Amino acid sequence: GPTGSGKTSTLYTTLRQLATREVNLCTVEDPIEMVEPAFNQMQVQHNIDLTFASGIRALLRQDPDIIMIGEIRDQETAEMAIQAALTGHLVFSTLHTNDAPSAISRLQELGVAHYLIKATLIGVMAQRLVRLLCSHCKRPLDQEDADGCEAVGCAQCRDSGYQGRAGLYEIMLMDPALQALVTPGADVQALRREALAQGMSSLRMAGIEKVKAGLTTMTEVLRVTPGDSETNPLFIGA
């Protein structure tokens, strides 16, 4: 997801669940955004040539079970992340992409061969943050055939109609059918169609569920999520 979509918070929460006494969990970050005693954290320092790639290379000598890379920004970091995964380590990282299937094309743009992506990628999660309706002033929509509520505004929410935020998630788990579509210059739309056929819930679909539950508005969901496809009635083309 983009900057400010909650990727770091989700990543740390996931790692905290995995960090037990038996697990050696190491991170390379720029900067270290949350100090966590259960992790072995390393900060990138360009003035001494400690980059993401060189940091991963150093961590591989420390017998880690899980490696977290703050962000994959360049080819060298991507290649080292793949190398770590190929040697039996569980690797977590973040990428700036619009949705989950686009992560595959992004890795290819960074120079990672398609067969290496097939061999190492387990899954991708895209996310966005959506504003929640204020529980003190929201009201049901007037239309009889419409589910959900609308924003009003009160002193509790400073007349914005919203209070708090929640995550929208799109999780794409790699299976043989999706792996078969990971080819040189992979078609992102073909990957998306197959993932949806396999049961993936898109960011927009996740948002619509929150609208139906009266937690947010359709306007808010359309603001933060990309369109799904031409076959979706709520598709908004670029």
Predicted regions located by residue number:
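Short, flexible helix-loop junctions that flank or precede catalytic/ligand sites
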Residues: 1-238
